[in-house]
């Protein structure tokens, strides 16, 4: 996750396929409803497909840039070396069991992400349902959040939480950065 925060997004968005990319992101997020955990899932699945020799088709199917994933993997290895040097983990290899003892504990991983990104925490204030879009019966929602410095922040359009239909397990979210465009995301 840390490597993905410091580098570009591995998703490629071909013209006219924005909805398919959005659905691929949502599928890769699973039921985590987290952009951060989605990136961890992307890495785990990509590493599996690298071992199987099917990484190119995986990347093609999910609109991922394999070259960016390789760069992120390199960053991940560098982070692991630094953590090993500081004696935070027992091995310099990020895939070593001792470096992943709690990787299956989603609650702990969420707590670590929150602590690492603090004070970048937002509270969901309101969920506004929008009318049906794209001719389907699905309806997107506008999620309005409050952060420490802003009273009206909306989810970025690329967030996997945009397809959550306003169903959230928690009323709090963490974020890496805020962007101002026509709205604050």
Where in this protein do the model-derived segments appear?
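Second RecA-like catalytic domain
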Residues: 1-185
């Amino acid at each position: 996750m840390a490597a993905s925060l410091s580098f570009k997004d591995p998703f490629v968005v071909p013209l006219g396929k924005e909805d398919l990319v959005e659905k691929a992101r949502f599928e890769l997020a699973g039921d985590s409803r987290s952009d951060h955990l989605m990136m961890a899932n992307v890495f785990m699945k990509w590493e599996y497909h690298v071992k199987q020799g099917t990484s190119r088709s995986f990347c093609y199917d999910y609109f991922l840039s394999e070259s960016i994933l390789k760069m992120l993997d390199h960053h991940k290895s560098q982070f692991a070396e630094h953590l090993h040097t500081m004696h935070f983990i027992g091995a310099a290899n990020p895939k070593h069991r001792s470096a992943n003892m709690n990787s299956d504990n989603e609650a702990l991983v969420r707590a670590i992400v929150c602590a690492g990104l603090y004070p970048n925490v937002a509270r969901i204030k309101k969920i506004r349902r929008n009318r049906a879009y794209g001719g389907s019966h699905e309806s997107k929602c506008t999620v309005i959040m409050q952060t420490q410095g802003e009273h009206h922040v909306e989810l970025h359009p690329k967030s996997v939480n945009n397809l959550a239909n306003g169903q959230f397990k928690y009323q709090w979210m963490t974020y890496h950065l805020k962007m101002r465009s026509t709205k604050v995301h």
